[in-house]
Swiss-Prot record:
Keywords: Metal-binding, Nickel, Zinc. The gene is hypA. This is Hydrogenase maturation factor HypA. HAMAP family: HypA_HybF. One of its GO terms (molecular function) is zinc ion binding. Belongs to the HypA/HybF family. GO terms for biological process: protein maturation; protein modification process. Pfam families: HypA (PF01155). Ni(2+) binds at H2. The lineage of its organism: Bacteria, Pseudomonadati, Pseudomonadota, Betaproteobacteria, Rhodocyclales. It comes from Dechloromonas aromatica (strain RCB). Zn(2+) binds at C73, C76, C89, C92. InterPro entries: Hydgase_Ni_incorp_HypA/HybF_CS, HypA/HybF. Involved in the maturation of [NiFe] hydrogenases. Required for nickel insertion into the metal center of the hydrogenase.
């Protein structure tokens, strides 16, 4: 489960930000997770709750925004929606599709007090 190490990385970033801003606690963390990122939202929620126990982020709400997948089809020469990382182009069926979006995970927002 790689979500545990991802949650630990998010916590480190959140703690660093809270420390830099002299915050007393973290109220909310908003993550953007791409549909093609191989990150399971429910698993990251579970892991986030586990790793934040006893930290400045304990009890913080975790909001996840799903980012749709997109890719460049070399056959169609256009951007197409993608639901699978190595899926076929929904327009022409070609597998020559280069992902251009939805593969990332990033911290979009941190709300602190």
């Amino acid at each position: 489960m790689h979500e545990m190490s991802l949650a630990e990385g998010v916590l480190q970033l959140v703690e660093d930000t809270a420390r830099r801003e002299s915050a007393s606690r973290v109220k909310l963390v908003v993550l953007e997770i791409g549909r093609l990122s191989s990150v399971e939202p429910e698993a990251i929620k579970f892991c986030f709750e586990a790793v934040t126990h006893g930290s400045i982020a304990q009890g913080a709400a975790l909001e996840i925004i799903a980012v749709p997948g997109a890719g460049w089809c070399m056959q169609c020469a256009e951007t197409v929606p993608m639901t699978e990382l190595y899926g076929a182009c929904p327009t022409c069926g070609s597998h020559q599709v280069q992902p251009t979006g939805g593969t990332e995970m990033r911290v979009k927002e941190i709300e602190i007090e």
